[in-house]
């Protein structure tokens, strides 16, 4: 795992370009404290910060081919690199290192722009082709590894993290204020835009090509659900179990020790179980709180005992939680008000003290139907199939039922992700200082639903999550919180082979109206004790709602909600009324309050210069 940066600027001075690209790389040094390197010529410059995991002695970057016509920088891991290396050697390529980076270099020589579709792994890389004057970038199938870009005239900047652009003189730092309403509703932007004007994320499974000042994006893979019928749940459980086991084994590849995150849920327990087959005493890590009702430590301890693995526990206090948030917003690049990022930050810090790589369970819910949202979609679909007269009668009988109210809307408007923080745009807009006249979040999501009109509703919602929620929330949080501590986090569920099994599953084996991850739990039951295979989903529960009612943290948050940043963007009177109602127990406004608080902290870091001094 590493950090990559670079830019194109035809006619540049190579010496000056090296200084700039080195400065960009220094801003993401947390991604790679083990080494650095840079390259520059009259058109392009590439930089790299290295976290050495495979071939520590020989994998330095930027890496050039034999005649110096190709230069590559790479962040991630290629799990089938040995297979590809052997294939390339058969075609006459010679290798000077044992690294997966060199496989990318020779793979590009051999296959060109078809290279990404041959890769199994998590990756973001850039290849500068001096002969053709072409910069070619690619991002992995799921968006596990980040890559953002910014274009101004003929100059293109790219980096693992947006903050690297701050060191380039062509970058104009401006808030993309038009998208603030979308962000407030969803906690993220569902498309490629960011909260920095002109900065975009390269979408998952896409390539970017720069040549002569022009940028072209292309999709190289498009995962689709294609259910296979006529197989039993037992047969599916066997196939999925085998795919997950093989993926976990592939994700072990490293020249350093690999650990596991263990929460006690089925996802992390299954990954840990597979790890113990080759590494019986795998180091495991969990996080929790002194407030036991919110802590997953008891469940993690029980899982560790059942699996026979050592467990390192981390406890987060309210003081820790609030004190770390400013640094967390710096590492995230864009504000993220998901409270789960904070315990993850501390969990990664604890793990890095013992190991350099961890396996984690992200992606299982999205692939195998684990979220309540998917079960709600089952019921919404059933509601739509009822006779209209029955629906009218039920709606009249239960006028306040949210399911019935949403069920009357078109599919693309029913998505709970579009109104995750605020149930309606009207409720959201009363806190904003100006009228943005923006499309609703549901309208932003409509193109994704339009692309999968032929799928049943739960499957369509899953697919939209793959394109939006997974890369823009779940994986961004996992990447940034782990890289903040120079820890490589790998996600075995998000693998090509596991995906092949997941997208062939009939919907009834993913989720029903009452149960999620049906087939995955059946697969886990073949390997885990029943209490682990059937463990309820917990996520990262946080006692934040309780803390916001304590005088110390109430006062801290109120100060932010009435400060100069809040005054610029929000109705501070409405914010304080919301905070007071929460404190009095009249409502649980934790999610809304934390969203406003995180935006303000993030804005202070990136736009008023309040960067934590110890970063």
Residue ranges and their predicted role:
Residues 1, 167, 197-204, 214, ...:
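Adenosyl-5′-phosphate
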Residues 1-332, 344, 348, 526, ...:
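Cysteine-centered catalytic environments shared across enzyme families
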Residues 134-136, 145-146, 166, 366-370, ...:
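Short catalytic/ligand-binding loop motif for oxyanion handling, primarily in non-cytosolic enzymes
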Residues 297-298, 324-326, 369-374, 547:
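Short aromatic-enriched loop/helix-cap "lid" or pocket-rim segments at secondary-structure transitions
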Residues 329-330, 372-379, 612-614:
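Short secondary-structure boundary/capping segments
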């Amino acid at each position: 795992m590493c950090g990559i940066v670079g830019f194109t600027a035809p006619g540049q001075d190579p010496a000056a370009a090296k200084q700039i690209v080195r400065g960009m790389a220094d801003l993401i040094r947390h991604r790679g404290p083990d080494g650095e390197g840079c390259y520059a010529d009259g058109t392009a410059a590439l930089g790299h910060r290295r976290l050495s995991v495979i071939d520590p002695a020989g994998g330095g970057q930027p890496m050039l081919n034999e005649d110096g016509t190709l230069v590559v920088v790479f962040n991630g891991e290629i799990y089938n690199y040995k297979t590809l290396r052997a294939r390339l050697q058969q075609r006459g390529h010679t290798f000077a290192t044992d690294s997966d980076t060199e496989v990318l270099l020779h793979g590009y020589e051999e296959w060109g722009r078809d290279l990404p579709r041959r890769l199994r792994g998590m990756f973001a890389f850039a290849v500068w082709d001096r002969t053709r004057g072409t910069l070619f970038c690619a991002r992995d199938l799921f968006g596990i590894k980040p890559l953002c870009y910014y274009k101004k005239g003929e100059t293109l900047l790219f980096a693992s993290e947006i903050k690297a652009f701050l060191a380039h003189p062509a970058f104009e730092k401006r808030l993309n204020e038009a998208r603030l309403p979308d962000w407030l509703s969803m906690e993220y932007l569902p498309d490629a835009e960011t909260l920095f004007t002109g900065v975009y994320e390269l979408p998952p499974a896409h390539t970017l090509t720069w040549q002569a000042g022009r940028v072209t994006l292309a999709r190289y893979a498009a995962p689709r659900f294609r259910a296979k019928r006529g197989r039993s749940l037992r047969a599916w459980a066997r196939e999925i179990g085998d795919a997950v086991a093989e993926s976990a084994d592939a994700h072990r590849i490293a020249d350093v020790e690999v650990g596991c995150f263990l929460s006690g849920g089925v996802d992390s327990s299954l990954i840990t179980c597979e790890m113990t087959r080759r590494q019986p005493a795998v180091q495991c890590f969990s996080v929790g709180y002194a407030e036991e009702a919110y802590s997953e430590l008891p469940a993690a301890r029980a899982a560790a005992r059942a699996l026979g693995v050592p467990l390192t526990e981390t406890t987060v206090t309210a003081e820790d939680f609030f004190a770390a948030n400013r640094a967390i917003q710096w590492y995230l690049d864009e504000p993220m008000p998901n409270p789960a990022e904070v315990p993850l930050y501390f969990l990664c810090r604890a793990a890095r003290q013992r190991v350099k790589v961890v396996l984690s369970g992200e992606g299982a819910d999205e692939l195998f139907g684990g979220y309540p949202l998917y079960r709600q979609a089952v019921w919404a679909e059933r509601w739509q199939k009822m006779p209209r007269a029955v629906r009218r009668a039920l709606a009249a009988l239960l006028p306040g039922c949210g399911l019935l109210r949403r069920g009357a809307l078109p599919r693309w408007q029913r998505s709970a992700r579009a109104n995750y923080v605020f149930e309606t745009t009207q409720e959201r807009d009363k806190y904003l200082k100006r009228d943005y006249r923006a499309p609703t979040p549901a309208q932003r999501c409509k193109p994704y639903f339009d692309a999968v009109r032929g799928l049943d509703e739960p499957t369509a919602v899953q697919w939209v999550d793959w394109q939006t929620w997974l890369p823009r929330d779940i994986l961004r949080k996992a990447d940034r919180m782990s890289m903040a501590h120079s820890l490589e986090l790998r996600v075995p569920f998000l693998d090509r082979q596991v995906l092949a099994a997941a997208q062939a599953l009939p919907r009834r084996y993913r989720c029903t109206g009452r149960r999620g991850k049906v087939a995955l739990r059946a697969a886990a039951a073949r390997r885990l004790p029943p209490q682990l295979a059937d463990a309820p989903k917990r996520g990262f529960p946080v006692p934040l709602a309780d803390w916001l009612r304590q005088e110390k943290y109430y006062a801290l948050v109120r100060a932010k909600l009435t400060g100069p940043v809040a005054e610029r963007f929000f109705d501070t009177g409405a914010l304080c009324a919301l905070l007071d109602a929460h404190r009095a127990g009249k409502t649980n406004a934790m999610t809304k309050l934390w969203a406003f608080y995180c935006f303000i902290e993030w804005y202070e870091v990136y736009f008023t210069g309040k960067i934590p001094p110890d970063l």
